[in-house]
């Protein structure tokens, strides 16, 4: 029998403008320092920023399966530890304080890591391209992890829609790890329990923005309640319709959205002629965000041109985010 989920009264929602993310990993570090420094959590990055196109973290997560197909829950694969990147250490003491002269090498020898293929992208100069894709638990409207859990340890908070794993009820079945198509629940081998992003709900309860959002140096991230018509997330998703979920075909109805990137045209064709083709192939963006991305890119281009001509654009003003307080719950860190 499927677990019964009570619909929340409100839904906390995130939007990231991929045109402003600089890949600095400040959100990654903020989350790591706040939530995953305990035993068995070395390999966990509840929030990570990966280069697209690329293998991602864990490696090849986009093909692991899970989610829903025709409304039916799908079983995916549990990523092996090597796909997350086995944590490695440097002999800092030997090099810095004991006078060892040989080259310091990490141990064990690294084979993968959360940002293993950072900045590689695809294509050949001068038409090579990539962009950064920050990822976290999507706190889905239809969370596959919740339905899959055999111990009813996962629930969606009534007051804000954040999806949480009840640590006392979790028995380490890993059904959530298997069923999430975004690979965002993690199995803690020390505690024998699943861990995942908690949406910084202790901060939300105090009226403070999540750590990842508050620390974003590029003001690329927005957070708020989707029913708040004054919030930037409502405006970007519902009013201007320029923010899209990642892989909507997975069927979980994510509550983390993205403004797709616009990198402009290719520099030149193989024959040396100038090109008007987009540097990021449209098919690549459609593979991530669905067919609607074409319409969104057209809207963004139109509004950008308005600004360039000195005309008003409410949408661009929201995306510029001159005041952090307009983009999030209190930005206090």
Swiss-Prot record:
Required cofactor(s): [3Fe-4S] cluster; [4Fe-4S] cluster
Region (Disordered): 101-121
Keywords: 3Fe-4S, 4Fe-4S, Electron transport, Iron, Iron-sulfur, Metal-binding, Periplasm, Repeat, Transport
GO cellular component: a single term: membrane
Subcellular location, principal: periplasm
Subcellular location: Periplasm
Boundaries of every 4Fe-4S ferredoxin-type domain copy: 12-40, 128-159, 161-190
InterPro entries recorded: 4Fe4S_Fe-S-bd, DMSO_Rdtase_II_Fe-S_su
Residues where [4Fe-4S] cluster 2 binds: 31, 197, 200, 212
Gene3D superfamilies tied to this protein: 3.30.70.20
Keyword Signal assigned: no
SUPFAM superfamilies listed in its UniProt record: 4Fe-4S ferredoxins (SSF54862)
One Pfam family hit: Fer4_11
Binding positions ([4Fe-4S] cluster 3): 137, 140, 145, 180
Alphabetized GO MF terms: 3 iron, 4 sulfur cluster binding; 4 iron, 4 sulfur cluster binding; electron transfer activity; metal ion binding
One GO BP annotation of this record: anaerobic respiration
Subunit structure: Heterotrimer of alpha, beta and gamma subunits.
Described purpose of this protein according to its UniProt entry: Component of the perchlorate reductase that catalyzes the reduction of perchlorate to chlorite and allows anaerobic growth on perchlorate as the sole electron acceptor. The beta subunit may be responsible for electron transfer to the catalytic alpha subunit PcrA.
Entry protein name: Perchlorate reductase subunit beta
């Amino acid at each position: 029998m499927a677990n019964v989920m009570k619909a929340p009264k409100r839904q906390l929602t995130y939007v990231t403008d991929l045109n402003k993310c600089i890949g600095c990993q400040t959100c990654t570090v903020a989350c790591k320092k706040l939530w995953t420094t305990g035993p068995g959590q070395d390999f966990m990055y509840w929030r990570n920023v990966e280069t697209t196109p690329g293998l991602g973290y864990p490696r090849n997560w986009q093909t692991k399966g899970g989610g829903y197909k025709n409304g039916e829950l799908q079983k995916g694969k549990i990523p092996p530890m090597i796909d997350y990147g086995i944590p490695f250490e440097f002999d800092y003491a030997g090099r810095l304080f004991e006078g060892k002269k040989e080259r310091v090498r990490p141990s064990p020898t690294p084979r993968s890591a959360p940002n293993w293929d950072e900045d590689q992208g695809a294509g050949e100069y001068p038409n090579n391209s990539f962009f950064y894709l920050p990822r976290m638990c999507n706190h889905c409207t239809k969370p596959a992890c919740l339905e899959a859990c055999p111990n009813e340890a996962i629930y969606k908070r009534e007051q804000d829609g954040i999806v949480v794993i009840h640590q006392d009820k979790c028995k380490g079945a890993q059904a959530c790890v298997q069923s999430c198509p975004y690979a965002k629940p993690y199995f803690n081998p020390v505690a024998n329990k699943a861990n995942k992003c908690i949406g910084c709900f202790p901060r939300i309860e105090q009226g403070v923005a999540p750590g990842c959002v508050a620390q974003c140096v590029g003001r690329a991230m927005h957070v708020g309640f989707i029913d708040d018509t004054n919030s930037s997330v409502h405006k970007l998703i519902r009013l201007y319709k320029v923010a899209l979920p990642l892989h909507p075909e997975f069927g979980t109805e994510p509550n983390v959205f993205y403004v797709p990137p616009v990198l402009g045209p290719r520099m030149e064709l193989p024959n040396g002629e100038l090109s008007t083709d987009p540097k990021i192939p449209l098919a690549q963006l459609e593979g991530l965000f669905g067919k609607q991305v074409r319409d969104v890119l057209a809207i963004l281009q139109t509004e950008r041109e308005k600004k360039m001509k000195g005309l008003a654009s409410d949408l661009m003003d929201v995306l510029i985010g001159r005041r952090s307080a307009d983009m999030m719950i209190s930005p206090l860190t």
